Amino acid sequence: MHYTRISPALVPSLSPTAAAESSGGGTMIATVFMALLLPCVGMCIVFLIYLFLLWCSTRRRIERLRFAEPVKPVTGKGLSVLELEKIPKLTGRELAVIARSTECAVCLEDIESGQSTRLVPGCNHGFHQLCADTWLSNHTVCPVCRAELAPNLPQCNENQSPC
């Protein structure tokens, strides 16, 4: 094999603009443009999807609230001292038999057998006497079930059992 040497004068030279086009200068601008444009478009699409999901969940929550059963409002100023005295008083031992509960729902402490308690008429929920008096002096509903207290509370003597 015999290689011939080609002189540079025999090879046609390219013009500077043709050399730039053949080296990929135009495609470099397109590559940079796409590298910047595609992430921006992608982030915009993700943001729009986020806004759509947020709108859907808010609309669903509003629909649920519109058709939900209204919460019983706690209104009224509470019971007077005379009305509180009409509510049956029991010992903790008697309350455990009647209400089958040994925890005061107001203070969340256990009711001891010798402690003075009150039994809410109607729903038979029991509480420490001080807790029940404090609650019922500000509210006219049971703190557990929100049942309204009977308008005519039963009259109890010291000798009578509330049962």
Curated annotation (Swiss-Prot):
Record key words, sorted: Membrane, Metal-binding, Transferase, Transmembrane, Transmembrane helix, Ubl conjugation pathway, Zinc, Zinc-finger
Stored InterPro entries: Znf_RING, Znf_RING/FYVE/PHD
Zinc finger region(s), RING-type: 104-146
Transmembrane feature ranges: 35-55
Biological process annotations from GO: cellular response to hypoxia; protein ubiquitination
Pathway noted in the entry: Protein modification; protein ubiquitination
EC number: 2.3.2.27
GO cellular component: membrane
Gene3D superfamilies, sorted: Zinc/RING finger domain, C3HC4 (zinc finger)
One Pfam family per UniProt: zf-RING_2
Reactions that this protein is recorded to catalyse: S-ubiquitinyl-[E2 ubiquitin-conjugating enzyme]-L-cysteine + [acceptor protein]-L-lysine = [E2 ubiquitin-conjugating enzyme]-L-cysteine + N(6)-ubiquitinyl-[acceptor protein]-L-lysine
Comment on protein domains: The RING-type zinc finger domain mediates binding to an E2 ubiquitin-conjugating enzyme.
Protein name per Swiss-Prot or TrEMBL: E3 ubiquitin-protein ligase ATL23
